[in-house]
Design a protein with these regions (language model features):
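Short, low-complexity N-terminal intrinsically disordered segments enriched in polar/charged residues
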Residues: 4, 13-24, 30, 34-95, ...
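A beta-strand edge to alpha-helix "cap/lid" segment located at domain peripheries
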Residues: 37-69, 125-210
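Alpha-helical packing segments of well-folded alpha/beta enzyme cores
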Residues: 76, 80, 120, 179-181
Length: 210
């Protein structure tokens, strides 16, 4: 299945994507997934707003009847985004990620190992030190697989380093982004492989670089 991250900006597409992921994870058809999880059916539910502009708190859309293990994974991911990542508590990233974790980045690259992932995450805070995740409007889990849609905010307030050693001057403009993290967890409840999706073009437009 191919997921176009640009479609996450529209509420109907977001719900449909959540429904499709639930169907795949549970080995069901879309119709069966909609019947089992009516809150994910875009034809039966109120569409979510534009996640790149919404200012209100969204009641999370998630499957019902989760077992204790599935709830634990979602709780761990909430702590990861809201506290560890947003607070730059890098020494705690090992609470949710395996030492040899592979992370697939939005630009098509990937990193191997926990420390490499931490260094990649730190770059965001060099030019937007107030970056934080504020909501998880969609949370899906099935067994050892999770898919979570998040809303993040920040401000382009510091120079953005470039590979050639130069830097882009800050514009002082704020941004709000929607992103999706798909993760595969191991038997120790640690992420062993992670896929990150976000609309980079939308962020560039908001901070004045596109």
């Amino acid at each position: 299945m191919t997921i176009d991250r640009r479609n996450l900006l529209s509420g109907g597409a977001t719900l449909f994507g959540a429904l499709a992921l639930t169907a795949v994870a549970g080995d069901m058809t879309l119709a069966e997934a909609a019947e089992s999880h009516p809150q994910l059916d875009p034809h039966q539910s109120t569409f979510l707003p534009n996640l790149s502009t919404v200012t209100t708190t969204i009641d999370p859309v998630m499957p019902r009847d989760l077992d204790a293990h599935e709830r634990k994974l979602l709780a761990t991911f909430d702590e990861l985004d809201f506290v560890v990542y947003s607070g730059q508590q890098w020494d705690r990233l090992g609470e949710s990620h395996a030492p040899d974790v592979r992370v697939h980045n939005p630009d098509g690259t990937f990193t191997d190992g926990l420390q490499a992932h931490i260094e990649a995450l730190k770059f965001q805070f060099l030019w937007a030190p107030d970056t934080r995740v504020v909501q998880h409007p969609i949370k899906i889990v099935n067994g050892n697989l999770t898919a979570v849609v998040g809303i993040g905010k920040g401000t382009f307030s510091q120079p953005m380093p470039l590979p050639d050693g130069s830097a882009i001057p800050p514009t002082g403009k704020p941004f709000q982004m929607s992103m999706t993290t798909v993760a595969r967890w191991n038997h120790r409840n640690l992420i062993e492989e992670e896929f990150l999706f976000l609309d980079l073009q939308s962020i560039q437009q908001q901070i004045g670089l596109a």
